Regions:
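Transmembrane helical cores of multi-pass ion-transport proteins
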Residues: 1-417, 421
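Short, contiguous clusters of charged residues that form electrostatic/catalytic patches at enzyme active sites
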Residues: 15, 175, 179, 455, ...
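The feature marks cytosolic C-terminal regulatory regions of anion transporters and related permeases
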Residues: 354-524, 542-550
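Conserved beta-strand scaffold positions in the cores of enzyme catalytic domains, especially
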Residues: 220, 442-444, 530-531
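Active-site-adjacent beta-strand anchor residues
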Residues: 63, 505-506, 531
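Generic hydrophobic alpha-helical segments
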Residues: 73, 153, 457-461, 537, ...
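Short acidic-hydrophobic, aromatic-tinged amphipathic segments that line or gate anion-handling sites
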Residues: 524-540
Length: 551
């Protein structure tokens, strides 16, 4: 910020004003779709938006409520009420802060792409499903809307004879306006244009045409200007235990979406965000937002891109966006009561379409079968069950896939005759050829020695079926070893000692050396059997063979 100029401030000011105006209809739509009042959506955009811009690790990230949280929030409110939502969001905030403090921001980026697309596509389908009632103006006659996907569609079909064609027309017109606006202006958001035009049109029809069948926000909510008021929810240990899985879902989804948004922004502006700082900011935002009546928030790709496209260069634009929304909440909020519910449904239809990434989804179906299986499992779990189940299963799948790929990259080879220097990439071998004495086997490990490959040694040795006098384990290309790997080596050493087979380690790097030394493995093996390179290891083996043969 040392080179920040007045011109930069004016650019950020204009970008912030535009983003604030763009964020207004989305905040209202996301709030209502989540099962809370429109004010709560705007409060979230104000509080979380300010904190994420002020403390975040990205210069241009815009935070606030997003479509990804609609399904989760709605489900929490149905089961635990508003207080449960507040507690779950604050817990998620703490989890996000911990992720950032322990520098796990980069780990989030390793979640496989098919899982992310499965999540987002599933969420898109679910958001679209939640808007069917408002698109068609269905009257459920007081019947409670089920939280699950299949239950919703059964209810819709049972009450499809109550279609309000006025709502249908408003929804179609709204979608049409949003779709064609970019052809006339890339900077003016279609959602804002649609809400202004449709709201004015419906108001005129109501006032001068006597048409009152189209539902508006004011028909369902009491809208008023208000100051931000702080209130801490009552904390109950039983509720905390029950809400912990949901909090994990909010935290993981928030982390994925915010870091994905920041990464997209980096690609456009040529910058690099700090993942861990961003997670800490997201965590603080989600901890503070519920205190003022907000809902879960994260980085929003659409608003972030609007910020960039309108010249936003620094966090000032995001702060201005929050201030603009605060002014709207204080002075213009009563006007929101005239916005038709079907128009907001049209906005969310476009949001769900953009979120679906159907072209990417279709492209991933051509990938290897394992990727396709992961994609479809995550997608259908998100749609048919809920996002909590999908994320839990998705993370398990991500871990399994990661372990599988690491296992595939770790190789163990056996050399029984000679080592060719032409095959050595690190110049460890200083001779023309190193002959391996009779009765000696050299095992070369290339990759991490962790629980996933610990049994490979046993498989290779049982396959060879012989019993050499000495085994040299060459570990120059082992970057790390875990407790299972240490246990495997210890067991191998103990079994070998019982069978009078000598074990020698070669080329252990400093990091692995410290771990093995700390574990007590070297006391079992003996310091004399730890060699810095293969030359030294073969010299020790040659002497040992000579002593064995002399007996």
């Amino acid at each position: 910020m040392k080179t920040y100029t007045k011109a930069d401030f004016m650019t950020d000011l204009m970008a912030g004003i535009i983003v604030g105006i763009v964020a207004l209809p989305l905040a209202i739509a996301f709030g209502i779709a989540s099962g809370v009042s429109p004010e709560k959506g705007i409060i979230t955009a104000i509080v979380a938006g300010f904190i994420i811009s002020f403390l975040g690790g990205s210069k241009v990230q815009i935070g606030g409520p997003t479509g990804a949280f609609i399904v989760i929030i709605y489900g929490i409110i149905q089961e635990y009420g508003i207080d449960g939502l507040m507690v779950a969001t604050m817990m998620a905030g703490v989890l996000l802060i911990l992720l950032g403090i322990f520098k796990l921001g980069t780990v989030i980026k390793f979640i496989p792409y098919p899982i992310i697309i499965g999540f987002t596509s599933g969420i898109a389908v679910t958001i679209f499903t939640t808007q069917i009632a408002d698109i068609f103006g269905l009257d459920f006659k007081g019947e409670k809307v089920p939280g699950d996907f299949i239950g919703k569609w059964i209810l819709y079909f049972h009450h499809f004879d109550t279609v309000n064609w006025g709502n249908v027309i408003v929804s179609v017109v709204s979608v049409f306006i949003i779709a064609i606006t970019p052809k006339f202006s890339k900077k003016v958001p279609g959602s804002l244009v649609a809400i202004i035009l449709v709201t004015v049109g419906v108001y005129c029809l109501k006032m001068y045409g006597g048409i009152t069948c189209i539902d508006t926000i004011g028909d369902r909510f009491s809208i008023k200007a208000q100051l931000l008021e702080a209130a801490v929810p009552a904390l109950d240990w039983e509720a905390i235990k029950n809400l912990f899985p949901v909090a994990i879902t909010i935290a993981v989804l928030g982390a994925i979406e915010s870091l994905l948004s920041a990464a997209v922004a980096d690609g456009v502006i040529g910058d690099r965000h700090d993942s861990n700082t961003e997670l800490i900011a997201q965590g603080i935002a989600n901890f503070v937002s519920p205190i003022f009546g907000g809902i879960p928030a994260t980085g929003a790709i659409a608003r972030t891109m609007t910020n960039i496209n309108n010249g936003g260069k620094s966090p000032v634009a995001g702060i201005v966006h929050a201030v603009v929304l605060l002014l709207i909440l204080l002075f213009l909020m009563p006007l929101a009561q005239y916005i038709p519910m079907a128009c907001l449904a049209g906005v969310l239809v476009i949001v769900s379409y953009n979120m679906s990434g159907w072209r990417v989804f279709k492209g991933l179906l051509k990938n290897p079968k394992s990727d396709v299986a992961v994609l479809l499992i995550t997608f259908f779990l998100t749609v048919i069950f809920d996002l909590t189940v999908a994320i839990e299963v998705g993370l398990v799948i991500a871990c399994v896939l990661f372990m599988k790929r690491v296992m595939e990259t770790t190789k163990i080879s056996v050399i029984t005759d000679e080592i060719d220097p032409n095959n050595e990439s690190d110049l460890e071998v200083h001779e023309e050829h190193l002959m391996i004495p009779q009765g000696v086997e050299v095992y070369e490990i290339n990759g991490p020695y962790f629980f996933g490959i610990a049994t490979k040694f046993e498989e290779i040795m049982s396959r060879l079926g012989d019993r050499p006098k000495i085994r040299i384990i060459r570990m120059r290309k082992v970057p790390f070893i875990d407790s299972t790997g240490i246990h495997n080596l210890t067991t191998l050493c103990e079994m070998s000692q019982k069978e009078n087979i000598h074990i020698i380690l070669s080329g252990v790097n400093e990091k692995v050396h410290k771990v093995l030394e700390k574990s007590g493995f070297y006391e079992l093996l003996g310091e004399e059997n730890i060699c810095s390179n293969i030359n030294e290891a073969l010299e020790v083996a040659t002497r040992e063979i000579a002593e064995i043969n002399a007996k």
